[in-house]
Amino acid sequence: LQRTIENFAVCKNDFFGYFKDDTLAGIIEIKHHTSYTHVQSLVVLPFFFRQGIASQLMSFVFMHYRKKPFFVETGVKNKPAINLYKKMGFVEVKQWDTDYGIRKIRLNKS
């Protein structure tokens, strides 16, 4: 995934960060629609893995955006992300292959 600063500057999505001390340790990107909320991306710096940051960002989103359902997509090989989403109440709804040969999974939370 390659995105430029210009892409972020014109993006209409919402971004929330998680700071640990003075370091931006994680960030979540949300696209909020009138009928659902889409988790566009969730990234945690590797140094901060396994510290609950992704879970805290997801919990914040659930409290801040009350419009359900929520949905998220990731690669089927991204087992840590899939496990996190399932722990947070998401269930798998479909899998498909992208034009780039990547197998993806979509999970929803009602």
Segments the model singles out, each with a brief description of its role:
Residues 31-40, 49, 68, 99-101:
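A conserved beta-turn-beta hairpin within the catalytic core of GNAT-like acetyltransferases
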Residues 1-15, 19:
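Active-site rim helix/loop that mediates acceptor-substrate recognition in acyltransferases
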Residues 18, 37, 80-92:
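Conserved N-terminal glycine/acidic-rich loop preference
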Residues 40, 45, 49, 73-75:
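Residue-level recognition of the GNAT/N-acetyltransferase active site
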Residues 44, 50-63, 83-87:
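Conserved acetyl-CoA-binding loop-helix of GNAT-fold acetyltransferases
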Residues 17, 23-31, 36-43:
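Conserved beta-strand in the GNAT
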Residues 8-11, 30, 57-68:
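Alpha-helix C-terminal capping segments
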Residues 71-79, 87-88, 94-110:
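C-terminal "cap" of GNAT-fold acetyltransferases
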